[in-house]
């Protein structure tokens, strides 16, 4: 009946759990810091260009929308917007002339958004910034295609795990 007794942690498994916890917490900190740093990089790009009419969160949102026509809900579910108040930023971007919005003919509650010419110009600034990074990230940052493939695969698996933990209450 020993197989029914709970498995006790050995020093090796305890050590492994401590190491895994440490690595997991470090990854969480890095993900948070990378998002903040990305916003800092975008803000710096707009500061250099003397653009004070838009903030980094809004510029990133415009880049993520690109040529698409989306609802506010789609912005969140597709991961295009990470903030808590997408409606506020959309309203602000409409007021600033960066976004056009139109009620859906099918569902009057849904508002579909797309970029104006000014919004596309902002999105292009972010695209040019990313292209500049791609031109030097291997040489300067030491990150090549293989590194990005591994990193993306790991982050996708973490995303799937978190999604499953919500859906299946893991």
Predicted features and spans:
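N-terminal helix-turn-helix DNA-binding core of bacterial DNA-binding proteins
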Residues: 40-85
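Generic structural concept
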Residues: 32-35, 62, 66, 116, ...
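DNA-binding alpha-helical recognition surfaces that contact promoter or target DNA
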Residues: 88
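Alpha-helical linker/hinge and terminal dimerization helices associated
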Residues: 34, 38-41, 45, 79, ...
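C-terminal regulatory/oligomerization modules of transcriptional regulators
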Residues: 1-19, 143-170
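Charged, amphipathic alpha-helical coiled-coil/dimerization segments
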Residues: 7, 91-150
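N-terminal positioning helix adjacent to the helix-turn-helix/winged-helix DNA-binding module
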Residues: 23, 56-58, 118, 147
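N-terminal leader segment of winged-helix/HTH proteins
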Residues: 1-52
């Amino acid at each position: 009946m020993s197989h029914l007794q709970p498995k006790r942690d050995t020093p090796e498994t305890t050590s492994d759990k401590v190491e895994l916890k440490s690595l997991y917490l470090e990854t969480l900190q890095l993900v948070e810091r990378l998002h903040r740093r990305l916003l800092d990089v975008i803000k710096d790009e707009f500061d250099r260009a003397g653009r004070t009419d838009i903030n980094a969160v809004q510029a990133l949102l415009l880049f993520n929308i690109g040529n698409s026509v989306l609802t506010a809900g789609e912005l969140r579910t597709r991961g295009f917007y990470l903030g808590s108040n997408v409606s506020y930023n959309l309203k602000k971007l409409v007021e600033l002339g960066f976004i056009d919005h139109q009620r859906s003919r099918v569902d009057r509650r849904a508002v579909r958004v797309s970029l104006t010419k000014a919004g596309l110009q902002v999105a292009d600034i972010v695209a040019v910034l990313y292209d500049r990074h791609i031109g030097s990230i291997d040489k300067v940052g030491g990150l090549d295609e293989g590194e990005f493939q591994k990193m993306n695969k790991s982050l996708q698996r973490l995303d799937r795990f978190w999604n499953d933990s919500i859906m299946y209450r893991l």
